[in-house]
């Protein structure tokens, strides 16, 4: 089966997508931490998420994310999917399409 190529419009949309929105769609469980008070950007939020048996604490600011436990981050839904699911770009793109993102 041949995979559909990712066009620039789709890639730009995924890069600009809010990390919090992408996290909610990708993770099996995601809950915002209402007690979190950001120090740098007032728009930052902290999320507790589960993917399979793995637990994450993710800071989200617009399309950017930072995994506080694994000390890794990135920007955009593709990077987030690759990080959370330990998959490559092609599988991340297919998964994002499946989720309707």
Task: Give the positions of each predicted feature.
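N-terminal structured subdomain of primase-like DNA metabolism proteins
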Residues: 1-101
């Amino acid at each position: 089966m041949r995979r559909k190529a990712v066009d620039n419009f789709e890639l730009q949309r995924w890069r600009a997508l809010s990390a919090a929105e992408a996290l909610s769609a990708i993770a099996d469980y995601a809950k915002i931490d209402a007690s979190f008070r950001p120090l740098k950007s007032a728009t930052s939020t902290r999320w507790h998420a589960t993917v399979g048996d793995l637990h994450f604490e993710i800071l989200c600011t617009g399309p950017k994310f930072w995994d506080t436990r694994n000390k890794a981050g990135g920007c955009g839904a593709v990077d987030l999917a690759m990080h959370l699911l330990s998959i490559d770009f092609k599988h991340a793109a297919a998964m994002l399409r499946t989720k309707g993102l």
